[in-house]
Amino acid sequence: MIIDRVEVETINSFSKLELLKEVYGLISILPILTLLLGITIEVLVIVWLEREISASIQQRIGPEYAGPLGLLQAIADGTKLLFKEDILPSRGDISLFSIGPSIAVISVLLSFLVIPLGYHFVLADLSIGVFLWIAISSIAPIGLLMAGYSSNNKYSFLGGLRAAAQSISYEIPLTFCVLAISLLSNSLSTVDIVEAQSKYGFFGWNIWRQPIGFLVFLISSLAECERLPFDLPEAEEELVAGYQTEYSGIKYGLFYLVSYLNLLVSSLFVTVLYLGGWNFSIPYISFFDFFQMNKAVGILEMTMGIFITLTKAYLFLFISITIRWTLPRMRMDQLLNLGWKFLLPISLGNLLLTTSFQLVSL
């Protein structure tokens, strides 16, 4: 059968179209891969920083043998967990046991979609950005509860119940604080919230307009991260390791990863909501406005924004690590009383006060 020239050109055009689709697909996932690489590096840095700061507080020597200054210690630990045997409980629910860590990790990773790390550097600038984060972060305790229930272990089950109770108790004050910030910024978009703080530089940050909300958000974030003094779901002296008791290998490593990812997400949201995000501390005259805008200047401005955002986030990280080695663990009744009887009324009063001021200013 003879194929004429028109049919050959048509076939070639379709093949080129398929090639373009493949190239476009690769380009579209490039930002996601870049973000995942950045998150991985950040987690490794946070683990190293925590060990070094903890060693300094306790006046001892931190990791020093795995690489220069112990920088490769986290990679060595992750590699060890990757190759350890994955032990499954004989009388547990194997499917839920395997799904639990995955739900926890995925829910935390999705939170990075709406975090603006720099100017024009956000995966999804949604109109409901902060509410999407709250909705996604409330899924993680379901994974922890599934992990505790499926282990068929009383310590694991108690740890899962504690994680769920703790998350519910502190999610509500956290939401009220976010609502107050949204009222001040007239938007739920994380990018709009940052830009609303850029007008007056350092004095335009929401931490000065919402000092009570900032303290409540700070405490609630630490509780959501299950850090000392709020690490009751995995209290070693009481519950062995809580919902992680029956886990080993890569599944245990996923829970370890979730802990530091939660800490990183909370640090970035404190920066975005209260510390001006990528904005510099001087009043709003951008250094880059003196130059003609081109690609090089745009990339440099974005890089500076990322650097400023991460610098502010590391301040929260330092505070959380210091608190870990300063305050003792709370009892479960004290933790619930703090959430329901103290933080909830204060955050609700702060929201009502903010609403009143916004109505008066109209």
Curated annotation (Swiss-Prot):
Function text: NDH shuttles electrons from NAD(P)H:plastoquinone, via FMN and iron-sulfur (Fe-S) centers, to quinones in the photosynthetic chain and possibly in a chloroplast respiratory chain. The immediate electron acceptor for the enzyme in this species is believed to be plastoquinone. Couples the redox reaction to proton translocation, and thus conserves the redox energy in a proton gradient.
Protein known as: NAD(P)H-quinone oxidoreductase subunit 1, chloroplastic
NCBIfam families assigned to the protein according to its UniProt record, in alphabetical order: PRK06076.1-2
Subcellular localization: Plastid, Chloroplast thylakoid membrane
EC number: 7.1.1.-
Cellular component terms (Gene Ontology): chloroplast thylakoid membrane
Topology relative to the membrane: Multi-pass membrane protein
One of the record's GO molecular function terms: oxidoreductase activity, acting on NAD(P)H, quinone or similar compound as acceptor
Principal location: plastid
Family statement: Belongs to the complex I subunit 1 family.
Sequence intervals crossing the membrane: 29-49, 103-123, 128-148, 164-184, 202-222, 247-267, 303-323, 342-362
Assembly, per entry: NDH is composed of at least 16 different subunits, 5 of which are encoded in the nucleus.
Organism domain of life: Eukaryota
Catalysed reactions, as listed in the record: a plastoquinone + NADH + (n+1) H(+)(in) = a plastoquinol + NAD(+) + n H(+)(out); a plastoquinone + NADPH + (n+1) H(+)(in) = a plastoquinol + NADP(+) + n H(+)(out)
Key word Translocase present: yes
Example GO BP: aerobic respiration
Organism listed in the record: Hordeum vulgare
Keywords: Chloroplast, Membrane, NAD, NADP, Plastid, Plastoquinone, Quinone, Thylakoid, Translocase, Transmembrane, Transmembrane helix
InterPro entries: NADH_UbQ_OxRdtase_su1/FPO, NADH_UbQ_OxRdtase_su1_CS
Pfam family, one: NADHdh
